[in-house]
Amino acid sequence: MKASPHRPTKALIHLGAIRQNIQQMGAHIPQGTLKLAVVKANAYGHGAVAVAKAIQDDVDGFCVSNIDEAIELRQAGLSKPILILGVSEIEAVALAKEYDFTLTVAGLEWIQALLDKEVDLTGLTVHLKIDSGMGRIGFREASEVEQAQDLLQQHGVCVEGIFTHFATADEESDDYFNAQLERFKTILASMKEVPELVHASNSATTLWHVETIFNAVRMGDAMYGLNPSGAVLDLPYDLIPALTLESALVHVKTVPAGACMGYGATYQADSEQVIATVPIGYADGWTRDMQNFSVLVDGQACPIVGRVSMDQITIRLPKPYPLGTKVTLIGSNGDKEITATQVATYRVTINYEVVCLLSDRIPREYY
């Protein structure tokens, strides 16, 4: 999907805020800890290349989801280490060696498939993924980890790192977190040779479990100024939200009592009202369940009336405003603010999803 720069809807990305968040987090973790910036999913909707270029001097490497995201960074001139967190296809090994990527190895079957196809593994760098309780990918038994490490090293692979991912680091109870941590430590203790890099800390672990950090952290949601727990846990220190979503009024009218708005005529004015149209809709990631949520105009909360359409929403204004008046969907307007977490709470989801769903049709502007 191409960006639509000829309409007022845009996402403003404060790159300085992201850098400040990295520095803030860095000040609260053990000195010498490597900082890996997670820029997968287009940097959580913020723009992977622009963000990576802005922060490359503040971090020690990058994490992405798949090899295509990694190639995008390399082709944009980013030279720092890139770890691909997901399982890669067998055909990706040659690309990983060509572009100097680090692959994740999560199972013996994957290694055996490479050996069966006689893929040249010499010079490949990998991290071993441990499934300590997340349940997605990774080795679950110490014996499998030992076998994998031996096989890889026998075929010229550099096993540089080992890592896991916590499922509940952003929740109030530590019970499951501690159980995962112990499983991971048990596997580490069983290894004849522990890889150089050991990392288990995502944003939530970095914020609320700093005492469990090994020698690297993966900075994701928090790097963009978002609270990984939503509204469950208070941040231990201030972070600056980096993304503002705004648009403008493109049509304003006064309608009589009884006038209906949107598909299904689900909203009917109970009096004479001022209704405005804003060019954003579910094709932009502003989903249909946002009906009745309020956006900000002139520092005032204005409810979305009628269903969210593919490309447009209608809002109720307290009075007529000129065409072009700014509408804030995420961010500050006057003395009021809408956060991604507030949007997520309304949708019964998480702030990660809110920013990741913002489509490419919305131009990103950086400052």
From Swiss-Prot:
Its EC number is 5.1.1.1. Keywords: Isomerase, Pyridoxal phosphate. The keyword Isomerase applies. GO terms for cellular component: cytosol. It is an enzyme of class 5 (isomerase). The keyword Membrane does not apply. Substrate binds at R136, M310. The modification N6-(pyridoxal phosphate)lysine is found at K40. The active site is at K40 (proton acceptor), Y263 (proton acceptor). Pfam families: Ala_racemase_C, Ala_racemase_N. Transmembrane segments: none annotated. Pathway: Amino-acid biosynthesis; D-alanine biosynthesis; D-alanine from L-alanine: step 1/1. It catalyses: L-alanine = D-alanine. GO terms for molecular function: alanine racemase activity; pyridoxal phosphate binding. GO terms for biological process: D-alanine biosynthetic process; peptidoglycan biosynthetic process. Its cofactor is pyridoxal 5'-phosphate. Catalyzes the interconversion of L-alanine and D-alanine. May also act on other amino acids. Belongs to the alanine racemase family. This is Alanine racemase. It comes from Streptococcus pneumoniae serotype 19F (strain G54).
